[in-house]
Amino acid sequence: MGNTKSGALSKEILEELQLNTKFTQEELCTWYQSFLKECPSGRISKKQFESIYSKFFPDADPKAYAQHVFRSFDANNDGTLDFKEYMIALMMTSSGKANQKLEWAFCLYDVDGNGTINKKEVLEIITAIFKMINAEDQKHLPEDENTPEKRTNKIWVYFGKKDDDKLTEGEFIQGIVKNKEILRLIQYEPQKVKDKLKEKKH
């Protein structure tokens, strides 16, 4: 947890964020000043996070997905994120090291936090992702994955699971490493998130 209540970012947090987000020091300081304007306390609530996330997707409904992203990064369940957690949350959805990203993806899909993923949880996240895909883009999705239910079924088949089976973190990560098609199916198009972040920054 970083202390982000002061007017300037600490050297340690800056270095860590430069490493994890690939933003320059100048860019991070700009993000931080913007963050403090919206969240003077140095912490962001779930509602504020949803509001900021919504600005990236004016032609879609990212609220449900934003709630799940927030949950997955609110490690101590206090209902807030500090600046470091906030930036990593935004960037982990669009970039990040492979292992970190897969570990985060498991947390995202483990909706109830019990250490395993079931098919219902996959459907919940996929449904949230579909709300972020505009109607025109949905028309161009392959026939066997153009609804949340179809995409969830396809993912579950790729993992070799029956409807009532559960996935452990090891199975989840191993399955994706072996079959990159699963990674494509479980995530919102990362390039679109990256583009939205760059638009917001300028």
Swiss-Prot record:
GO terms for molecular function: calcium ion binding. Ca(2+) 1 binds at residues 74, 76, 78, 80, 85. It comes from the Eukaryota. The keyword Metal-binding applies. GO terms for biological process: visual perception. Residues 25-60, 61-96, 97-132, 147-182 form the EF-hand domain. The N-terminus is blocked. The keyword Isomerase does not apply. Ca(2+) 2 binds at residues 110, 112, 114, 116, 121. InterPro entries: EF-hand-dom_pair, EF_Hand_1_Ca_BS, EF_hand_dom, Recoverin. Keywords: Calcium, Lipoprotein, Metal-binding, Myristate, Repeat, Sensory transduction, Vision. A lipid is attached at residue 2 (N-myristoyl glycine). Belongs to the recoverin family. Calcium-dependent regulator of light sensitivity of cGMP phosphodiesterase in rod outer segments. Controls rhodopsin phosphorylation in a Ca(2+)-dependent manner. This is S-modulin. It comes from Aquarana catesbeiana (American bullfrog).
